[in-house]
Amino acid sequence: MSENRTRFRLDQRRAPIYEALEQFRQMRVVPFDVPGHKRGRGNPELTAFLGQQCVGVDVNSMKPLDNLCHPVSVIREAEELAADAFGAAHAFLMVGGTTSSVQSMVLTVCKRGDEIILPRNVHRSVLNALVLCGAVPVYVNPEVDKRLGISLGMKREQVEKAIKEHPNAVAVLVNNPTYYGICSDLRAIVKMAHDAGMLCLADEAHGTH
């Protein structure tokens, strides 16, 4: 990250959110707000199921723990550490799983009538985002491995053809990898998209498996 964007001295041995939660737990605050299990006191069945260590730090957003809507302390530091670890300019912690992240990504880029190039086997969150923003999908049909019976990634030739036929598309979206672990040539696709003045979006929800 650039120096003007980084507020904290980055130390990858730190775990800012965990550390803040642990400090808050040790304060033994008596809760009068949400969640209703009151750090386990109000729901012994839930505590027995999840464990005291878990419910003891399941607390409401408050100043010592920062606020995800406008992070300025521990969440902001965690985001900067994540960006540094990933080699990215910025990182944003999300709630709602990768579905909300993918939808946010598409809605940030596309508006009504915009074309976006994407594989036919995208996650439904992408399709939901297109419905919400009114963008027009330009589908690339991935080939199928007949022996394994699974769909593959987008080929460079397929993406190149789609870009030439739809030069006004605003972005190319790639599953990296697919739900079966198949990766497209992401580096080549990114270059093709950028050379055409398009953004390249990557759904990497299954990339950690």
Which role does the model predict for each range below?
Residues 114-174:
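PLP-dependent aminotransferase-like
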